[in-house]
């Protein structure tokens, strides 16, 4: 569905345009990238994706560019310090969730071989193409997203719900 029909939600915003043209709808099998998206989605709860994308570089710097091992090892002191970082959403639960989620992701990697293998296990390794032509057609949840969300929650991933 990545086509000119999407332009309305990013036109005139270079950060959103870059995200749309180079990441949205693009398959990426990198665990670090997938962990970054998981964390940023968590940070976006109750906010717009645009807000988070405009804070993305601050998040990358604060959270070791989403290196999973580094995030899993972050100290309470370091996380507390981030609560005063104006570049981040200064919500205690959201900040602390990055470390917690990294620790859970490490367990997922041990079980599945990678975060990527875990994520793709919900679709039997196949990309889903809903045939949507405009953003308004894209559902906010599906049977697969509900199943994935429930499994992530069961494993201890924070902010992994469907809206």
Predicted regions and their residues:
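HhH-family (HhH-GPD) DNA N-glycosylase catalytic core used in base-excision repair
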Residues: 1-163
